[in-house]
C-alpha cells in the first residue's frame, strides 16, 4: 500500500510510475484519491471545530447552572452539534473506505533501476554464470539468449526433457496423480523423493550458516495476511480458499512470514530479522492454461525454501543484493548454469519495487527458465500489515521494509538438475554438494538398477 503523503506531495511521480507499469486505467485514480482526501481532511477539520465548540458550550452550561441561569438553548445547540458530528463521522468513515479502496489496489513505486517494458520479453539479463551444455540444434537460440557471454559445451546428442527423464528413472507417476487429484499434480518416487528432501536440507543449512532463523510456518493463513502480502488479483488466479473458513492455503512461505509480525512495533536493535521458511506451496495456476502442462515445472503443489528479511528502509537495497546472491550461490554449488534478470515494469507485479529472477539454462528445453525470484517490497507490505519499528520508546515508529527471495523451489531445482546433469543413456549425476544428503551420486534408468537409492 502506498503512503497517502506521497500522493499528496508528489502525485505526478505516482502517475508516471503507473504509466511505466502500463497501468493506464489507474492513472486517474490519483486525482480521485486527492479529491477524496481533500474532502476527508476538510470534514475532519470541521469535526474538530465542532468538538471544540461543543466543549466551550459545556463549559458555559456549567457556569450558567452555577448561577441558576437557563441552559435550555445551549443544551439544544449542543445536541445539534453532537448530531452533526455523528453525521460527519459517518461521512468521514465512508470517504476513508473509498480512499483505502484505491490505495489498496495501487502497485508499489518502482526503483529507478527497473527497466521499462511491457512483458517478460523486455526483462534485462544483467549477469551470467556457468558453462552450459547445449545441443547443436539449440545453439543459435542459446547464443541469442546468453548474449554470447557464457561458456558452453556442444552436445551432439539431443538432451531429454525432464518429464522424459522422470519416466526413465522411475521418478514420478503423473497418470495416477491425475486420477487421484487432476492435472498438474504428481507422485514423486524413489530417488527423486530423496533429492527433493536433500535440496531442502542443503538450502536450509546454507542459510542458517548466514544467520537466518529456520521457520516452518502455518500452511494456512487468514485473509488479512493474504491481503497484506499480495495483490487482490492473486485471490482469483493463485490462492486456494478453505471453504466456509477464513483460511487460505499459502502459495509461498513469504506470506505467513510477512504476517508473522503484523500489527507489531519491532525493536530497531533487532533489525534486520532474517528468516528462512520451509513449506509446501499451493497454487491454482489459473492463468497458465496450456503452459508447461507436462512434468513438474508448473504445478499446484511443491516444496520451497524461502528467504524473508525485515530491514530498516535505508538498508533494504543492500539486502536485496544479498538475498539474490545467496540464491545464486546455491545454484552455483548445484552446478546449474544461469542468468540473472532485472524484471521490467510490465512483468514486475504489484508488490515489488524491484525484482530479480534467476533463470536456469535447461538443455532439454533449449531455453532459460525461472527458478528464483527475489523482491524488495519496500514498505508496501509493511503498511498493509502495520509492521513498524523504532529505536527508542519516545520515537515515532517507522515502517520496516520487507524482502523475499526463493532459496530453492524443489520441483524447479529438480528439473534443472535432471536436464543439466543427464547423460546420453538417461543417467543423472547428483551434484557433489548433495551427496551427503542423498547418500547416492547418480540416478540410473529403471532397467539398470536393482533397487532404489543405491550408492
Curated annotation (Swiss-Prot):
UniProt binding sites for ATP: 283-285, 299, 370-373
GO biological process: selenocysteine biosynthetic process; seryl-tRNA aminoacylation
Highest classification ranks of the organism: Archaea, Methanobacteriati, Methanobacteriota, Thermococci, Thermococcales
Species this chain originates from: Pyrococcus horikoshii (strain ATCC 700860 / DSM 12428 / JCM 9974 / NBRC 100139 / OT-3)
Protein name: Serine--tRNA ligase
InterPro entries per record: aa-tRNA-synt_IIb, aa-tRNA-synth_II, aa-tRNA-synth_II/BPL/LPL, Ser-tRNA-ligase_type_1, Ser-tRNA-synth_1_N, SerRS_1_N_sf, SerRS_core, tRNA-bd_arm
UniProt superkingdom: Archaea
Gene that encodes the chain: serS
Pathway terms, separated by semicolons: Aminoacyl-tRNA biosynthesis; selenocysteinyl-tRNA(Sec) biosynthesis; L-seryl-tRNA(Sec) from L-serine and tRNA(Sec): step 1/1
Compartment annotation: Cytoplasm
